[in-house]
């Protein structure tokens, strides 16, 4: 490990001169060293079968939306069920630091996710107030979550989660539509004081006697559910807990980090700046088909921390349909169709541009054009497909009308992504995972003109714009170290950051350390 650490230190110093002097990188080097050791010397628990896993073993088990995207392990990443009483599970099969009961009415767990990212100097013809900084930077983000749940009856569950999000993003999370770290809170003044993330009731209404087995987790206590059922959720949560899920690209703790990979960038879902909202969701599940509709509160202002409690005048309406079947090569796949409508106190890009051209202000100001009751709507196709050899293929295509301002998630009006995901069975590290994905983001012409005239969004604003699509490639490798400990290497390459051909490209490597308690 000493040699790995020295090698890693020398490599980073050569790639990023002066970085080691400016940044306390001991933690990062330790993570890198452990990952390298795990890759070079694959290890197995005593007694583990030395034969590689059968490549015909399915990678994904079809499950309902009974998981959480920020705490979840979706099917491909879900810890296996607890071993029978009196049986000691092999250490390679235990993916949490402490065991969790499969039968208790209580749920208590936690997680810690620490992300280190940096970039070197990159070319930029000019920079503005909201630009991604061309000078070298390094940052660390930290998210800690406590998950609590209780099963009141066989059909009623309650959840309470407390979270702390600290640290900062590169350039204070400005200058990129597809920002490099989903864990970053976009308002650095909020600090890391713990806050209530979720407070929610889940009610299950059986519609059939047949039952199906599902994974138990932080937002799903039952291990079996009626095959046909209604589910009603009410309270505080984040919309990606239940909408826009994807087995291969939705989890910033063990998978990708970019926030236009883990979610549809054009899905401007209702949320405050921390990503949470209050609302209600009604879901229907029937074997291979699911449908869900939700109504949630919108923030009072774009990227605001406070929600507008008047749901009659401001709200987000979301509808998603999904179907699971053996679509290709007799292997499981899922297709999801999503639509949304937001109603809020929004500004209009075309109106802001026209006011500027009429001499109102030195730059266009979208805030001055805000009017209550404006709409923004969009659609998405989301798919995942299991392939042979422990591979998975996934992608999203997102579209929003883009006339009114980006309000809650990020400044994207069109997005396309495609990626691959695999687990480490082939190299005898079945709990490791790796993936690569390409994303292209765009905005509508009026939005481009607004930024070109010097206007500021809540994320973007270079003072001028040479327009072009923002193109991102991200790759990662996550190594399972022991029980609930994971370490990851991540790299992202971004062309035309903030839709600006006059800036970039920029290369953003990163390290991630994750613990599941």
Across the structure, where does each feature detected by a protein language model lie?
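Outer-membrane beta-barrel "beta-signal"
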Residues: 197-210, 505-517
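Surface-exposed coil loops of outer-membrane beta-barrel proteins
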Residues: 174-198, 208-320, 364-365, 455-465
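Transmembrane beta-barrel strands of outer-membrane/channel proteins
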Residues: 112-118, 160-164, 232-236, 293-297, ...
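N-terminal periplasmic/intermembrane-space "pro-region" immediately following the signal or transit peptide
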Residues: 43-137, 147, 151-153, 157, ...
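Outer membrane beta-barrel transmembrane domains
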Residues: 322, 338, 342-373, 394, ...
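Short loop/turn motifs that connect adjacent beta-strands in outer-membrane beta-barrel proteins
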Residues: 96-108, 120-121, 150, 154-158, ...
């Amino acid at each position: 490990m000493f040699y790995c650490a020295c090698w890693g230190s020398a490599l980073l110093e050569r790639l990023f001169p002066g970085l080691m002097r400016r940044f306390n990188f001991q933690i990062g080097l330790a993570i890198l060293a452990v990952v390298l050791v795990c890759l070079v010397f694959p290890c197995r628990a005593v007694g583990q079968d030395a034969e590689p896993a059968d490549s015909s073993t399915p990678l994904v088990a079809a499950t309902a939306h009974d998981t959480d995207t920020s705490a979840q392990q979706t099917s491909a990443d879900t810890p296996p069920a607890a071993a029978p009483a009196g049986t000691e599970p092999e250490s390679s099969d235990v993916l949490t630091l402490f065991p969790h009961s499969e039968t208790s009415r209580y749920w208590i767990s936690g997680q810690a996710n620490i992300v280190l990212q940096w970039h070197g100097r990159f070319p930029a013809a000019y920079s503005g107030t909201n630009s991604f900084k061309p000078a070298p930077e390094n940052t660390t983000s930290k998210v800690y979550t406590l998950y609590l749940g209780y099963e009141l009856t066989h059909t009623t569950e309650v959840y309470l989660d407390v979270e702390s999000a600290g640290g900062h993003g590169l350039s204070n999370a400005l200058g990129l539509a597809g920002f490099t770290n989903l864990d970053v809170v976009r308002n650095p003044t909020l600090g890391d004081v713990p806050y209530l993330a979720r407070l929610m009731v889940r009610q299950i209404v059986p519609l059939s006697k047949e039952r199906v087995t599902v994974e138990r987790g932080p937002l799903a206590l039952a291990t079996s559910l009626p095959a046909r059922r209604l589910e009603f959720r009410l309270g505080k949560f984040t919309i990606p807990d239940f909408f826009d899920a994807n087995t291969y690209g939705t989890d910033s703790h063990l998978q990708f980090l970019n926030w236009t990979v883990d979610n549809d960038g054009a899905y401007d879902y209702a949320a405050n700046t921390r990503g949470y909202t209050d609302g209600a969701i009604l879901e229907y599940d029937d074997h291979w088909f699911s449908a869900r509709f939700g109504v949630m509160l919108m923030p009072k202002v774009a990227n605001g921390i406070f929600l507008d409690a008047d749901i009659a005048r401001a709200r987000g309406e979301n509808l998603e349909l999904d179907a699971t079947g053996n679509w290709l090569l007799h292997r499981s796949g899922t297709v999801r169709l999503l639509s949304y409508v937001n109603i809020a106190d929004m500004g209009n890009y075309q109106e802001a541009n026209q006011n500027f051209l009429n001499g109102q202000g030195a730059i266009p100001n979208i805030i001055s054009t805000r009017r209550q009751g404006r709409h923004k709507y969009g659609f998405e196709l989301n798919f995942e497909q299991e392939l042979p050899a422990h591979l998975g293929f996934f992608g999203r295509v997102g579209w929003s009308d883009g006339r009114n301002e980006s309000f809650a998630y990020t400044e994207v009006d069109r997005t396309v992504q495609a990626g691959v995901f695999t687990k480490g069975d082939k190299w005898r590290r079945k709990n490791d995972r790796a993936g690569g994905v390409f994303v292209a983001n765009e905005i509508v012409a009026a939005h481009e003109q607004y930024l070109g005239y010097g206007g500021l969004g809540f994320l973007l604003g270079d003072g001028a714009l040479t327009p072009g699509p923002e193109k991102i490639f991200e790759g990662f490798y996550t190594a399972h170290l022991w029980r609930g400990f994971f370490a990851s290497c991540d790299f992202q390459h971004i062309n035309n950051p903030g839709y600006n051909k006059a800036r970039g490209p920029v290369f953003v490597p990163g390290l991630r350390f994750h613990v599941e308690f």
